[in-house]
C-alpha cells in the first residue's frame, strides 16, 4: 500500500485601481485627494476615498493630516491555510472583509543635519481579521473580530553624519484592542506595545555601486 496526499488548490480574482491628485491651494497648503476602487470575485466591489492636507509654514517644517476609508478582503491563506508546525494555523472560509476608517496627524521637520517626524494615528476596523488561539493543542484559527481599535504614535529622529552616512532611530507606541460580540475589549495578540529601531545607512552615491544599512 502506498501513501497519498490530496493537494487542494484555491484562487481568487482581485482587481484594484488607484487614482490620486495634488492640489496646491496656496504657497503653503497642499491638498491630496485619492480614490481606490477594488473588485473581488467573492466579496464584491468597494470604493475607498482618502483626503490629505499638508501645511508648510516654512521650508523646514510640514504639518500633515489624513483621513480615509479602507477595504481589505481576506487573503487565500487567511481563508484556507492549514499550517502544521510548532503552532498549528487554520484558515476560515467564512471570513468577512475588513472595512475601516482611519485618520492621522503629524509633523515633519529638518534642521541642519538632523531631521525627524512624529505622527499620531487612529484606526477603527470592522470585522478585523486576526488569528486567535483555540485554547487547545497550540491551534490558532483566523476569525473576524467585531471591532478593532488601533491607535498609537510613531516617532523618528535622524542625523546625517556625512553626505554618505546617516543614523536613524525610531519608536512606535501601539495600543491595539479588539472586541468580539458580547465581550469587552481586550488587547490584540502579537502586537507589541513598544517597538524600537535604530539603523545606520550608508550610500556611496554610485561611486562603487552599493549601499547598505
Label every PLM stretch briefly.
Residues 10-12, 56, 60-62, 69-125, ...:
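Outer-membrane beta-barrel signature, preferentially recognizing the C-terminal barrel domain
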Residues 24-27, 31, 121-124, 143-213:
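Gram-negative outer-membrane beta-barrel transporters
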Residues 1, 33-37, 65-69, 78, ...:
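Transmembrane beta-barrel strands of outer-membrane/channel proteins
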Residues 43-45, 61, 75, 115-117, ...:
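Short acidic, gly/pro-rich beta-turn/loop elements at beta-sheet edges
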Residues 39-41, 55, 177:
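Short, solvent-exposed loop/turn segments at secondary-structure junctions
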Residues 8-40, 46-50, 165-170:
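Surface-exposed extracellular loop regions of Gram-negative outer-membrane beta-barrel proteins
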Residues 1-5, 43-48, 77-82, 90, ...:
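Outer-membrane beta-barrel translocator domains and adjoining extracellular loop/strand segments
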Residues 24, 30, 52, 56, ...:
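Membrane-spanning beta-strand positions in outer-membrane beta-barrel proteins
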Amino acid at each position: 500500500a502506498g501513501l497519498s496526499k490530496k493537494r487542494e488548490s484555491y484562487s481568487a480574482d482581485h482587481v484594484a485601481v488607484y487614482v490620486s491628485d495634488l492640489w496646491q491651494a496656496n504657497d503653503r497648503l497642499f491638498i491630496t485627494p485619492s480614490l481606490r476602487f477594488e473588485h473581488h470575485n467573492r466579496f464584491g466591489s468597494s470604493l475607498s476615498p482618502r483626503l490629505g492636507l499638508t501645511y508648510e509654514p516654512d521650508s523646514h517644517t510640514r504639518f500633515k493630516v489624513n483621513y480615509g476609508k479602507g477595504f481589505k478582503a481576506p487573503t487565500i491563506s487567511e481563508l484556507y491555510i492549514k499550517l502544521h508546525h510548532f503552532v498549528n494555523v487554520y484558515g476560515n472560509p467564512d471570513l468577512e472583509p475588513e472595512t475601516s476608517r482611519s485618520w492621522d496627524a503629524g509633523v515633519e521637520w529638518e534642521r541642519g543635519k538632523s531631521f525627524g517626524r512624529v505622527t499620531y494615528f487612529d484606526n477603527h476596523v470592522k470585522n478585523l481579521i486576526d488569528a486567535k488561539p483555540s485554547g487547545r493543542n497550540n491551534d490558532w484559527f483566523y476569525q473576524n473580530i467585531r471591532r478593532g481599535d488601533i491607535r498609537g504614535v510613531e516617532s523618528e529622529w535622524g542625523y546625517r553624519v556625512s553626505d554618505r552616512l546617516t543614523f536613524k532611530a525610531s519608536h512606535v507606541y501601539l495600543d491595539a484592542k479588539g472586541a468580539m460580540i458580547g465581550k469587552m475589549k481586550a488587547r490584540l495578540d502579537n502586537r507589541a506595545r513598544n517597538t524600537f529601531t535604530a539603523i545606520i545607512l550608508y550610500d556611496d552615491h554610485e561611486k562603487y555601486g552599493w549601499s547598505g544599512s
